[in-house]
């Protein structure tokens, strides 16, 4: 699923974004943010973070630097615990 979402973002960046121009008020751009969020957090959480970011990108927003949050150590610990329980 991650691969499909990233491919769609790449298509948007190559085919659609040049026609719209550079309108994002944030760094990195919303499409780059979405790609990074999906790569770091997976398809579901990454899409959620990307949608939240796009909703914040509007003419009344000051914009600025808005980096993808690092993966939560609690989430990673839960994933490792699940992986260990499946090995038993």
Swiss-Prot record:
Residue segments, region Disordered: 68-88
Biased composition regions of type Basic and acidic residues, renumbered to the chain: 75-88
Record-level GO cellular component terms: plasma membrane
Superkingdom, natural source: Bacteria
UniProt similarity note: Belongs to the UPF0161 family.
Function summary: Could be involved in insertion of integral membrane proteins into the membrane.
Protein name: Putative membrane protein insertion efficiency factor
Species for this entry: Burkholderia cenocepacia (strain ATCC BAA-245 / DSM 16553 / LMG 16656 / NCTC 13227 / J2315 / CF5610) (Burkholderia cepacia (strain J2315))
